[in-house]
């Protein structure tokens, strides 16, 4: 990989290391010192300090990981290219017109009759949020969460096992006990234990808050809330408690409005000014 060729370049690494190691005596300011030290540490963390044999082995592992991640993504995308067919418009009750039109267009593209809820988040989430047919909510939700886990040619379990094994090999080669230790080294938490401690502190209040939300949903639904019910009844609660409808917010998040807001905040916060170039002009 190109990144390995850069990281394993001994002359480049030694130059970066020399700058970082001598930062205190070379007159670098705090920002320059920080950049040099982080660059050196990143090179070391990715194998620059290994001997030739170690670099060769790490290169093999990194290539295998890259291939595994590509294969994983291809399998998930293949499952996302499937869809749930809805043959009756009654199955679309509750959906906004824009989502109905998108489902109809998806069906035409795939040469199927009716409407197609494609197995992607952009198609599934609106359906789970607005469609009234609970049986279809369950069907669409289960299909979505089972991407890459159907025991067929697109099943990812063996690929995941391969990735886990390769990550462990890489961690050991770089002097870490496991992938989590290697991954957390360059974070604020520093260690897996510290990260886990933070998550456990957040877990109890987060769980309590979700329980409150589910109780509100159950009060409206009149039955126990299942995973495929969550988005639908969250929207119902939002409407009942706050008189807030997602569809009423959409005009405010139209592309040009979002872009204008982004430019406005960039100017307010950072002093950046954006001006449209004449057609065909090139900025220098």
Describe the predicted segments one by one:
Residues 1-182:
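Noncatalytic, helix-rich "gating/capping" subdomain that lines the substrate-entry/channel surface
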Residues 31, 35, 67, 74, ...:
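Active-site-proximal, well-structured secondary-structure segments within enzyme catalytic domains
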